[in-house]
Amino acid sequence: MNTDINNYIVRNNQIEWQPLIEKGIHYQGISVISLRFDGAKQRSTTIMLKFEPGATYPYHNHPGGEEIFVLKGEAILENVTLSQGDYLYTPVNFKHSVTTQKGCIMLFVVPEEVEILKTNKLFTNEKN
């Protein structure tokens, strides 16, 4: 293990927002910064997402759960508004979508790859 702490720091001046593209899908109005890349899993497990006003991430499942901390703005998950400073932990196999009216920046810890679910529902309590 490398014991130089500098190898584990992500400096603000070293990173830029990139469009969120997963499996060839470009999510309009959502940008990402990777904070921790897991080489064994070949994916980022700690990220920041920036949602422009009106942006939506589709209904999906979290096989490994998820942690969210709202850094700025407001996000809506399952018809519940999370605001700056709010924290959410979702258990294994929790399903939801994310949208925002005002825009937001959130910190995510996502141990396993999400699974996009084919549905017309934006929230689980809506009917098809």
Where are these regions (language model features)?
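A short, N-terminal "cap"/entry segment at the start of jelly-roll beta-barrel domains
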Residues: 1-43, 123-128
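Conserved hydrophobic/aromatic beta-strand scaffold that supports enzyme active sites
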Residues: 32-34, 46-50, 67, 87-89
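Glycine- and acidic-residue-biased ligand/ion/polar-headgroup-sensing regions
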Residues: 52-55, 62-77
